[in-house]
């Protein structure tokens, strides 16, 4: 025992070292689940030496005979003796022997799903067995399923064979499975002997063992493509790269390669296992064995494909976003290509709608939409799976939103099973809506209970938050997606099924109309409009809700403004009640006064389209709002019962004429409140009675298009006998009440559209043009979308002279793509000058004026430069004459003046319109011609050899004269005398003419040469005198000193 202990310690150290190396190799990605991938930690071991040591151990230790006998079959670790030995003995040598024993290398083939590899003993047993008659590997094609179909035709002759009972059939399946494993080994050996000895195949096999990752993947693809049945080991190697949890870089490269290989291997039908085959009647001949080989291969392929799908599902849940997206793309690729395991793949793809990352959830939505576009027959299957996903417990709102958003993007039609699919979608939408509302109510109840408990615990706290939201309020995005889906699916539902939906879901939709979110309310109104148009039933409740939505501030500022205007147009065109249409038109004009230009133009264009279908509304454009007492007009007064006396009756009898001019100025002589709460409640209570007469009054207004006041109202005998309650007084003329909740009874047909007069004076030219067109009695002709064409972004694009974009667009859904702004016919930049002002669109008049002014300013600046050309020539002549320092200084001055003029060119262009005379009177500009004149005079004085004293006196006199002139000018401007200003203007003009006619002050050298010679002689004389005078002074000083 003392001899064994040091051996066990060294063996333990060796095992620890090998395990550390193996773990390090696996951490850097060198090892995989299968040793056949080209690298294994057993490469570090020496199997030959370890075997010899194990064989020598029994000779050294003769005391442990039982241990030696049990330790002989070391090649099979999992046998029963080894298990019994590990259970009976707890010796220190036993773990040493187990750790030293290397894992067996896998055989050539495997049928097990375990990651331990192939069982070598079983293949060794096949070597001793005789070979069975089997088809040669070289005779088969690359498409194994076609070869299998041929063998089935040979064996069974095309007849259908029933499969036996599964319980009695399991024993036969196990026997046939072992036989199929033997046939596959024999088939692989045949392929290795026939084609594996070539140079190309040897190079591929060497790349499998000792190549890079890319080389190994390429080698595996070549081997599987050459013969998939004989090279299942290569397929398992690729599958091990994907299923391995170590080294995710292998999964990136292995997913694409393995998916492409499996697409080629899988048939167009679903794979079958051995339990689904008639194995009990298969003959034991060459064709029968060959057919059993194909069936066994199909069973193995089915098992491996299930492992691949499971690996894809795990990869789609990985924390690495790139691997997750790669797995999603592979799932979509396998779903669209083959039908095998489509249920599991679809579940994995739908589950990604609940991914915590928005990008992954959006990718799943995108892939599902493309899947239905490629396979429209899968709509029902996909909807059922999404339905089961939506109603899972504890599912988040974000996941539900993505699921509903996907369902709303499904394209439908009136053909085939699509009407049933549309009905199924609507059922899902409303079922989800009920679940969401119940959850919201339950949550609100719990919050209220908690707040009540908190109030009881803190009685001093008087502040309490009151929730003003209705119990219907939910996440606006989910509600918007739900209503979008219902709006898209409802037109495709059959008429019989649509009636059931209307009866059960209309109350819910009216609750959603009053939601705090404007987009939800608009979509609810759209659905109600579709319901009413499909059943041809006009709902006063719908028009009342739509009329109230117009006053909301978010009506034109939301993302659904275009949808809301379209809904208004459809509702007003389909309405037969002319009074209600007039009320809507009046309110639309009121809204247009308060909105930006693009929405104001949209409202005016809406009214133009309504006027086409309702011509009686044209008289409201020009009619005056007045109630005058005339003899030929019938007046109806309410019957006053008892001693009720109207306090305002006397005022109404005295002054009944109330007028409003069309500029929007009201002239009213009535004083009083507009309404009271009691009278409003009474009017609402009587709205049902007035509904009966609304249609009759509208028909009378349609028949009486000409304004004949005598036939405006016709009252039947029943109406004369009926006593009418007193209506509430209105502060507006004509009885128009803008605050009435019922549009049919606000008397908008008596009001005038004076808002058009205000809009015709709008600052925006497009608004003014459209309003003026309606005032002139003609319809607006516009082919674009004013909400987009007149927006601020479109104006800035034009101002920046932005060129049109390409025709490609991005964004939007496939069922409702985003609309691209049409910029093909847009006139950009200076091109607008080619059009006349009358041909320019109103919204482009600003740019037309801008470029016209810019062109005129450039022309004026060019003319000014041409006028200054003679002065520049004079300066150049001066520069040519003066070659000394004086010339250089003058040149710099000229350059400075030229730069100053170029810098101030824009300022001079702005001052062109100012009167030159006024500028000279104010002394605003400095005349550089005066400076040239002074310079010329000074030069002449210098040439004439004037003494310094005389020059100083002359300059002083000039300065005095200039001061006198300035004083005279100041006095003239201060007194405001016209004569002096006219005289000054004349003098200044004469001076300018004289300066223009004056010759250049610089004379030629030849003309004044004799004067220059005289100057030189005089200079010499003066020098002589200067030298003689000092000598005389010295003599005088000496004489004085002697004296």
UniProtKB/Swiss-Prot annotation:
Gene disruption: observed consequences: Female gametophyte mutant with impaired progression of the mitotic cycles and lost synchrony of female gametophyte development leading to an arrest of female gametophytes at the two-, four-, or eight-nucleate stage and characterized by unfused polar nuclei. Defective pollen development.
Record has Nucleus as a keyword: yes
Transmembrane segment boundaries: none
Residue numbers spanned by region Disordered: 32-113, 444-469, 632-737, 861-1043
Keyword terms, alphabetized: Nucleus
Biased composition (Basic residues): 47-59, 988-1000, 1032-1043
Renumbered ranges of motif Nuclear localization signal 3: 1022-1029
Subcellular location: Nucleus; Nucleus, Nucleolus
Biased composition (Acidic residues): 632-645, 688-699, 872-983
Location, primary (coarse class): nucleus
InterPro entries in alphabetical order: ARM-type_fold (IPR016024), CCAAT-binding_factor (IPR005612), CEBPZ/Mak21-like (IPR040155)
Subunit annotation: Interacts with RBL in both the nucleolus and nucleoplasm. Binds to NOC2.
PANTHER family reported for this sequence: CCAAT-BINDING FACTOR-RELATED (PTHR12048), CCAAT_ENHANCER-BINDING PROTEIN ZETA (PTHR12048:SF0)
Family under the similarity heading: Belongs to the CBF/MAK21 family.
Name of the protein described by the UniProt record: Protein SLOW WALKER 2
Lineage, highest ranks first: Eukaryota, Viridiplantae, Streptophyta, Embryophyta, Tracheophyta
